[in-house]
Amino acid sequence: MADADVDVGPVQPKKRTFKKFSYRGVDLDALLDMTSEELVKLFHARARRRFQRGLKRQPMALIKKLRKAKREAPSGEKPEPVRTHLRNMIIVPEMIGSIIGVYNGKTFNQVEIKPEMIGHYLAEFSISYKPVKHGRPGIGATHSSRFIPLK
């Protein structure tokens, strides 16, 4: 049994390959370098219409606040959260890495913007209702519920 020495040699660990992010076939670096006109062409119809009609004062103010928060953040740190009520704001590549407090009608839910969120609305990441947890039927829900004994 001692004669069965098998020389395996240095074992190299497998290199992990990560999926490179792309939005509609365009990688993230190219998205960040695009002009707004080129970027709008990649969005879905509703978002294209929204951007073609122009960004009004409030969405532009949010983007300016996000730029300021990123600029003032120390390198390697996350920027300060920026609170907003603009649930209908469409996420653009410039916002990636920012933290936004999106108002849901009661509280501000902090959302960290990731590349996968491009083209979506802020509201999609801050749910404004409490999902229903269906339980037992109440009294008077159906005719047969009259015969359900009360606890």
UniProtKB/Swiss-Prot annotation:
Top-level taxon of origin: Eukaryota
Molecular functions per Gene Ontology: RNA binding; structural constituent of ribosome
Keyword Signal tagged: no
GO terms (BP aspect): ribosomal small subunit assembly; translation
Gene3D superfamilies xref list: 30s Ribosomal Protein S19, Chain A
Gene Ontology cellular component terms for the protein in this record: cytosolic small ribosomal subunit
Keywords: Ribonucleoprotein, Ribosomal protein
Family: Belongs to the universal ribosomal protein uS19 family.
PANTHER family from the UniProt entry: RIBOSOMAL PROTEIN S19P FAMILY MEMBER, SMALL RIBOSOMAL SUBUNIT PROTEIN US19U-RELATED
Name of the protein in its database record: Small ribosomal subunit protein uS19
Taxonomic source organism: Picea mariana (Black spruce)
